[in-house]
Design a protein with these regions (language model features):
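Short, solvent-exposed secondary-structure boundary motifs
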Residues: 7, 147-152
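N-terminal secretory signal peptides that target proteins for export/translocation
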Residues: 1-11
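Intrinsically disordered, low-complexity regions of eukaryotic proteins
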Residues: 4, 18, 305-308
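Hydrophobic alpha-helical context, especially transmembrane and signal-peptide helices
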Residues: 20-22, 122, 148
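C-terminal motif of bacterial Sec signal peptides marking the signal peptidase cleavage site
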Residues: 25-29
């Protein structure tokens, strides 16, 4: 009798154990497998961006909008950290930073962007664009996209960052200053006896660049978020520049511009127009429609577009 009771109890314990095992397997099949995937989807992607912009520059403000829009579109799964001028030490260049993985993206100043693509030297030439709208059409359109695709294969160009027109300061040694640089000099009363000209000759463009290998590791959705956010921030930046001319802000910051009727203004304007034509003449064999982005007036109705 005792042996039968023992056997019965043993069988009961076995059934309980078997039931627990089956329940564990069932739970693993229904709820266990997706857990790692869920955790991965919630993992944040951090994008560090190095620039040589001041915090109040036009280019930095566009990148701030880009960062905000990207975080919103990705529902906080992508976070952008911007670094302005002075936050990165030399001797390493921005190209070195992105190659070493110190940052994910860099906004290249002229010397470094020319190092990656010598043809980008064109963007330092005066009077390439006939209006602010022409600049926007160029960098937002197919011509700008083609120019970005000429970067070395190991790099990917997200887009061109607009930083406004440069201003010519003549204190005995003429030099071009960005909006942010001139604003600082005006606010700190550091212009002294310098003469400043608003020639609308050079518009500052810097490519936002990352490694192609890093870009390829992103999902299609992440790439789309980045591209859409950058494009929307670009549109907003140009709308703000059109709505309120940055030169007006400089005037309120203590900057005084020479009138365009003065001999000095006329002299510099003619000088830089000649510089542009000489550059085009020397590079006529290599410049295509998108390397020479002078935008002419729209053709009259019925006329066909001509290559610039």
């Amino acid at each position: 009798m005792e042996k039968g009771v023992f056997t019965s109890r043993k069988c009961g314990a076995f059934l309980v154990t078997l039931t627990i095992i089956l329940l564990m397997l069932l739970l693993a099949g229904c709820g266990g497998a997706p857990a790692p995937q869920s955790a991965a989807s919630e993992q944040k992607l951090a994008i560090r961006v190095a620039t040589d912009y001041r915090n109040d520059s036009i280019g930095y403000q566009q990148l701030q909008d880009f960062a905000r829009l990207l975080q919103e579109k990705s529902e906080n799964t992508i976070v952008v950290k911007l670094y302005s001028t002075g936050e990165w030490s030399q001797p390493d260049s921005f190209i070195d930073y992105v190659k070493l993985g110190s940052v994910e993206m860099v906004c290249l100043e002229p010397a470094e962007m020319n190092q990656l693509q010598p043809a980008y030297a064109l963007y330092q030439q005066p009077y390439l664009f006939d209006s602010l709208q022409a600049v926007e059409r160029y960098i937002s359109g197919e011509a700008g996209s083609k120019a970005l695709r000429t970067l070395p294969q190991s790099y990917y160009g997200v887009g061109f960052v607009p930083d406004g027109y440069q201003y010519l300061m003549d204190d005995g040694q003429p030099q071009w200053l960005s909006y942010g640089e001139l604003k600082q000099k005006g606010q700190t009363k550091a212009l002294g006896d310098a003469v400043v000209y608003d020639l609308r000759a050079i518009y500052s463009l810097q490519p936002l660049v990352t490694l192609q290998s890093w870009w390829d590791e992103l999902s299609q959705e992440q790439q789309t978020w980045i591209q859409e956010s950058f494009a929307e921030a670009l549109t907003a930046s140009f709308a703000q520049q059109a709505d309120k001319d940055p030169a007006q802000t400089l005037l309120s910051s203590g900057v005084v511009f020479q009138d365009n009727a003065t001999p000095g203004w006329q002299s510099y304007s003619g000088l830089y127009l000649n510089q542009r034509e000489n550059y085009f003449a020397e590079h006529s064999d290599s410049l295509t429609a998108y390397w020479r982005p002078v935008v002419a007036e729209p053709p009259a109705s019925g006329e066909e577009d001509e290559a610039p």
